[in-house]
């Protein structure tokens, strides 16, 4: 639907002063949502949410991606804090960081 300039102005104007979110809040939200900005990372998070923990090899078996690609996605999730890992000899066990997930949910709720 094409609007006239007058209609567009009427639609987009408000008498209320909008408050911008705190910079730290916005940066936190951007960082955590960026970690979920790829479908493979969303699938990894979903997989880890449904399991208590998961070895890297088990994650690779569930994903239609090369092991190196899965490792890169896990690295991003770990760097943003959504995922934690524990090294057990030659194996790496991954799990969801429940505090970070709760923080993400709280940030989204504040939108």
Where in the sequence are the language-model features?
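Short, charged/polar, Gly/Pro-enriched secondary-structure boundary elements
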Residues: 99-105
């Amino acid at each position: 639907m094409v609007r006239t300039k007058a209609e567009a102005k009427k639609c987009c104007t408000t008498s209320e002063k909008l408050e911008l979110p705190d910079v730290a809040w916005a940066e936190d939200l951007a960082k955590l949502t960026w970690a979920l900005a790829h479908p493979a990372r969303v699938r990894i998070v979903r997989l880890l949410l449904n399991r208590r923990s998961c070895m890297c090899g088990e994650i690779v078996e569930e994903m239609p991606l090369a092991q190196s690609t899965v490792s890169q996605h896990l690295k991003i999730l770990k760097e943003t804090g959504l995922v934690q890992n524990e090294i057990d000899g030659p194996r790496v066990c991954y799990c969801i960081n429940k505090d970070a997930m709760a923080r993400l949910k709280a940030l989204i709720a504040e939108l």
